[in-house]
């Protein structure tokens, strides 16, 4: 029977569903059969318009950008110059309320602490969501967004654009076809450091900035120079440190290749905990349980210049040390793979000199933003939907929980509970400022 629902009504009805698969996005064919031409453009609004958010807006510019929102009038104005037909707002809540009946999807590129309220409101309104990494500021928020997306059957994507690269796909293929045997150990490291954060006082709020809206759900406090627009990542109230910022990119590959979701034990070490600022360095040790035929995995994260000791023992095919500033190292029973965003290498180099790589089975990405757009139009799901990326972000943020609590935590993912530490449990979520809700 022919449906009387037109395409735009269909897109807004929230009927898209599907199960994520590692090789691409899965189409709900029964529902998609009713869709008209995918050439019809989506109506999209953006929350946040500066820095990375601007790249996200440009990434979906093939569609109709109907409204832009930013708490900084100067940044908003610069973005609006390129999207002159877009209506502009300062408060995302006002924008979503006024535009709800006109839009299909929302792109979110705000500081970490405001991701979840923005995304939750959009999902409850039945809008498809693209949200920058890390998906949320707390573990509880990540679980909440994943559940909302599933309940409302919406197409979601976390902004980890490295996931769309060819290099990650080739590494996943090597690991999953057994090139280095079973993997029980992995290391991830980055050289970045975000330590030394301090609030300042006495500076007036810039005229173009609505500081109250910028704070959003965070605790109320006087304006602090430098926090906006660049250094909020250094503060616990707004950011998630190096681990939250880069873990979503680098740990993504390990989660993807080894089919990881929820660790059961997390321990962290670093300098004494600063209640204000994130640490200049951190080491986190995760333990993941067995998955079907796959063995348990120990994954170690390093930042701020710390790196795995094993890295110092490795050599390339010319015998030179592998002095990689950032990367991933998979340690298998029959060899190793070292990788980063754009390269990878099988080790020992002499053992794999004549290795014949498996035939590629993960299709080339159409682009991280494009994948989300096409998934919406074809009633599909994406490779970094909130089910996959939510679990990844939960694991990433649990490293911060372990560090800040000073505890080796035993994690019950099903019940979202730290079994052995009341202090750590209090860090699974946060109290929202009056007037703000998840």
What do the PLM-derived regions correspond to, one by one?
Residues 1-18:
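N-terminal secretory signal peptides and thylakoid transit peptides that target proteins
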Residues 16-83, 162-165, 254:
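N-terminal Rossmann-like dinucleotide-binding module
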Residues 32, 170, 182, 187, ...:
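Contiguous beta-strand/loop segments that form the cofactor/metal-binding neighborhood of enzyme cores
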Residues 87-91:
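Conserved SAM-binding strand-loop segment of SAM-dependent methyltransferases
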Residues 94-101:
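Short amphipathic alpha-helix with an adjacent loop that forms part of the alpha/beta core around
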Residues 106-107:
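N-terminal Rossmann-like NAD(P) cofactor-binding module of classical short-chain dehydrogenase/reductase
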Residues 111, 116-164, 178:
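Beta-strand-loop-alpha-helix segment that lines the small-molecule cofactor/substrate pocket
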Residues 157, 173-174, 183:
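Hydrophobic or amphipathic alpha-helical targeting/insertion segments
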């Amino acid at each position: 029977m022919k449906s009387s629902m037109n395409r735009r009504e269909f897109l807004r009805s929230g009927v898209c569903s599907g199960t994520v698969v590692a090789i691409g996005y899965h189409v709900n064919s029964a529902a998609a059969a009713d869709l008209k031409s995918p050439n019809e453009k989506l109506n999209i609004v953006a929350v946040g318009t500066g820095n990375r958010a601007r790249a996200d807006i440009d990434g979906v510019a093939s569609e109709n950008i109907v409204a832009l929102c930013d708490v900084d009038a100067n940044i908003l104005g610069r973005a609006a110059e390129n999207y002159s037909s877009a209506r502009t707002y300062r408060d995302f809540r006002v924008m979503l309320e006024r535009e709800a009946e006109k839009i299909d999807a929302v792109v979110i590129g705000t500081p970490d602490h405001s991701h979840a309220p923005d995304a939750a409101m959009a999902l409850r309104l039945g809008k498809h969501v693209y949200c920058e990494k890390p998906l949320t500021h707390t573990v509880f928020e990540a679980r909440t967004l994943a559940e909302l997306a599933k309940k409302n059957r919406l197409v979601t994507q976390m902004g980890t654009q490295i996931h769309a690269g060819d290099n990650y796909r080739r590494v996943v293929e090597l690991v999953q076809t057994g090139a280095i045997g079973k993997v029980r150990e992995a290391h991830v490291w980055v050289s970045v450091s975000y330590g030394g954060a301090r609030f300042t006082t006495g500076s007036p709020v810039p005229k173009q900035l609505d500081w109250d809206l910028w704070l959003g759900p965070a605790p109320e406090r006087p304006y602090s120079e430098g926090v906006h627009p660049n250094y909020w990542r250094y503060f616990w109230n707004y950011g998630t440190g190096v681990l939250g910022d880069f873990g979503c990119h680098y740990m993504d590959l390990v989660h993807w290749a080894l089919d990881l979701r929820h660790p059961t034990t997390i321990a962290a070490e670093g300098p004494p905990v600063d209640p204000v600022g994130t640490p200049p360095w951190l080491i986190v040790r995760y333990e993941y349980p067995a998955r079907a035929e796959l063995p348990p995995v120990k994954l170690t994260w390093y930042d701020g210049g710390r790196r795995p000791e094993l890295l110092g023992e490795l050599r390339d095919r010319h015998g030179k040390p592998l002095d990689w500033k950032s990367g991933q190292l998979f340690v298998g029973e029959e060899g190793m793979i070292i990788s980063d965003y754009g390269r990878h290498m099988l080790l020992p180099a002499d053992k794999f000199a004549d290795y014949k790589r498996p035939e590629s089975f993960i299709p080339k990405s159409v682009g991280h933003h494009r994948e989300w757009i096409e998934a919406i139009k074809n009633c599909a799901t994406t490779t970094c939907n909130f089910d996959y990326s939510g679990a990844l972000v939960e694991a990433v943020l649990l490293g911060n929980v372990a560090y800040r609590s000073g505890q080796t935590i035993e994690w019950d993912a099903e019940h979202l509970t730290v079994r052995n530490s009341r202090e750590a449990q209090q860090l699974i979520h946060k109290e929202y400022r009056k007037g703000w809700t998840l």
